[in-house]
Each structure stands twice: as structure tokens, then as C-alpha cells.
């Protein structure tokens, strides 16, 4: 890595010149291969129906992230009572906190396993079938979590969190890929962002349900976990009417006629020959003997650098610190002087603002003047500046300057909003734009697994580090967001509206120019 940085410092050409040179190189190569850009398509009612139905699976992910915040203390008290009734032992507060921490972390453990398996399942059984049967895990988890108090058996919560982690892990690898494979090239960003949009909606709803006025009581908290069955049943009712990915049908089943029929239905017209030919050409270029079996081939040859970039894009999302703010937002607000139910209200309010910002990203991500790269760099840069200001205002607040507490809340808001405009939605579907049909499933699985690993690491380490160095813990995120912003600027091409082959050529050219 040091060698790469050193070579970057020696590079005397400006990035803009390099980028234009790269684009010219790619365009020339595309013309030589007789590739033409696909015509822009519009939203159709059926495309919107399919995208909305598929993205319902993402609701589970966001709900499980947000639902544990408010009722956590209530569940810990119940665990202590339940343990005494089961085993006749009195748990200390530390022991009860540890059991609850294990239950919370099992979500990430399940997510790692589920995301790693998602590529195999998607390629073996198809995108649609995998998504359909994945709902079984969600329903089993909902039963375990919501009836744990009824049966007075807290290990059901631990097991339920693992099951729902498996479900969400499969979802995180499958849904962004499925969405972008159904979308036309000019709408890939909008369609891919539905994954993060549903996560944001679910986080807000779960936090609202956890308020004391609704289900945030000793009697009501099991109903929070039962609510996740609603979108699960809704998807079970709608997904059978959706279509399979045409790219999957061509690359895995060689069923061009069915792929054509699906494209005509999605696009709302019969002029799909050009798009179908692009899919066939993509398959012909990429379906070649792989010398390394399974996932190993992703880290060999032409796949190696795109896979590394995909993983680092996922790291840029999680190491930005958004998980720390999401998991511990109530605690952060309490330390800022908010009391009573005010921290919970503030957390719900922030979730609503983040949701609005995610909606804003939908309109910018495919805009000619923005695209993925600029939004991602802008988001990381905004988070970098916000994290510095959070540290400054927390320091002033601790020194007795009460006005700084209000400024701190403002900068946390800035931190969350800038995340929603780039690092939130973009990494999820970025991998699907880099890889072709033959390797997309496995690549999406590996990148999603890296996201879960990073999420687990941040959730596990932030609170202990924060207890030691206090507000200066946010300087970690300053370093990471700055580093990943530079990385995106130097090594990540714009993917908006481009084919995987064109993107990979530009990616290879950028790497060669910078590292030479």
C-alpha cells in the first residue's frame, strides 16, 4: 500500500487529464468492438412493481438495525428476570449486558454467513426463487423473537437474531444485484438505490415503534419484532408476479427467448433487440474457463482489481462511522444533555431526515452532472468535515459551553445527511456494475460479506474505544473518510450508464496510469 501511495505522489499528471484520457481510451475500444450505448428507457408500471417488490426484502435489514435501540434496556431487564426463573441465578448487570450484546452481534454473524452464501444460491436457484424462499428465514426469526417472552426463554432471542442475520445477509448480496439486472442502463442507479431507501424507511419505522407511546414498554416490546412479518407476507404475495433476471436466464440457463419476453414486459415495448444483444455479448465475453474454482477466481487475473475496488467501496461505507451513530445514537444524545425520552425522539427525527436525504439521492444518482463517483466523494468529504466538527463541539460541550451541544447535534445531522447522498446507497449496487453476468453473483456475495464484517468490527469496537478516548473516537472516522475519498478519486471510475466491459477497461487503465 505504501508503494502505491508513493507512486501516486510521483504522478505529475492531473487527475482530470488522466480521467479524460481514460475515457477516450475506453470509447475507442468500445467503437472497435462495435458496441453502442443503449437508448434511454423510462419507468414502466411493471418495472416499478418488480423493483418495489424485490426491495421489500431490504426492509428486514433496516428494521433489525433500528429496532434494538430503544427497547434494549427493557429486554436486558427481562433477561435478568428470565435467567433467574430458568436457572435460579441472579445475573449481574455486566452479565446481562453481555448476553444482550451476544444477541445483538449474532445479527452480524448471521449476516456474514448469509451474504457469503448469497452468490451460490442466486446462481444455483435463480434470483427470484432465492428471494422467495429467503422469506422463510425471516418468518422463523420473527416467531423466535416475538414469542421469546411468551415462552420465557431468552436464548430464543439469540437464535432469532442469528436467523434474521442469515436472511438479511442473503438479501444484502442478492437484492442490489437483482435490482440492477432488471434496470435499464440509464436507471441502474435509481433502481439500485431502492435497497438503501427501504433500509432507511425501516430504520425510521422501527425506531418509532420503539417509543414508549407505542411498543417501547415491558409488555409491548415483543410486538416490535412481530411487525417484521408484515412486509415479509407482502413480498410473499407479490414476488410470484415478478420476473426472473433476464441476465441470469441468458448467462446461466441460455434461455434467450424467455429473456426477450421478460425484457419486453419490463420495458413496455418490443424493441429490445439491442439490449438483448448486449446481454448476449456480455455473456459470450465472460463465459470462459476459469482456472480457479469458485470464489478463488475473483481474486485472480482480470477479476482481482475490480474485486478489491468493490470490497474497498463497501469498507468506505461501514468505516465511515455511520453504524456507530446508528447503534449508539441514543447514548450520544444523552451525553449531549438530552434527557427523558428526548434522545429517542431525536433519534427518530434524525432517521426521518436521513430518509429524506436518501430520496434526494435517487434524483441525483443518474443525473448527467452527478453520477456515482462525484456523489460518493462528496458524501465522504462531508462526513470527514462533519466528524472533525463533532469532535470540536463535543470538546467544547464538555468544557461547559452549553451552546456547543446544539451545534454538535447539527453536525451529527450533517454527518448522517452526507452519508445518505453517497456512501449509503452507492456501494451496494456498485459491484453489480463492475462485474458481468458470469461472475456477478459471487462478486456480490464477497463484497456484501466484507460489508457485514466491517459492520461487525465497527459495532464491536466503537463503544470500548469511545469509553477510553471519548469524543476523539470520531477522529477514526475522519481518517477513514478522508482516505476513502482520495481512493475513490484516484482509483474508482464513473459507472453511470456504462457496460461492465467498458467500466473494467477504464478501471484497468486508471490503475495502470497511476501505478506506472
Swiss-Prot record:
Compositional bias per record (Basic and acidic residues), positions renumbered to this chain: 27-37
Biased composition annotated in UniProt, kind: Low complexity: 14-26
Positions of region (Disordered): 1-37
CDD domains attached to this UniProt entry: MFS_GLUT_Class1
Protein origin, superkingdom: Eukaryota
Tissues of expression: Expressed in seam cells from the early embryonic stage through the L2 stage (at protein level).
Keyword Transferase: no
Coiled coil ranges: none
Locations listed in the record: Cell membrane
GO terms of biological process kind: monosaccharide transmembrane transport
Record topology, Extracellular segments: 69-101, 160-161, 222, 328-344, 398-409, 466-471
Ranges in the topological domain labelled Cytoplasmic: 1-47, 123-138, 183-200, 244-306, 366-376, 431-444, 493-516
Keywords, alphabetical: Cell membrane, Membrane, Transmembrane, Transmembrane helix, Transport
Annotated TM spans: 48-68, 102-122, 139-159, 162-182, 201-221, 223-243, 307-327, 345-365, 377-397, 410-430, 445-465, 472-492
Pfam family for this entry, one: Sugar_tr
GO CC term (a single one): plasma membrane
MF-aspect GO terms: hexose transmembrane transporter activity
Topology relative to the membrane: Multi-pass membrane protein
PANTHER family found in the cross-reference section: FACILITATED GLUCOSE TRANSPORTER HOMOLOG, SOLUTE CARRIER FAMILY 2
Recorded family membership: Belongs to the major facilitator superfamily. Sugar transporter (TC 2.A.1.1) family.
Its job: Appears to have no transport activity for glucose.
NCBIfam families: SP
UniProt-recorded name of the protein: Facilitated glucose transporter homolog
Native source organism of the sequence: Caenorhabditis elegans
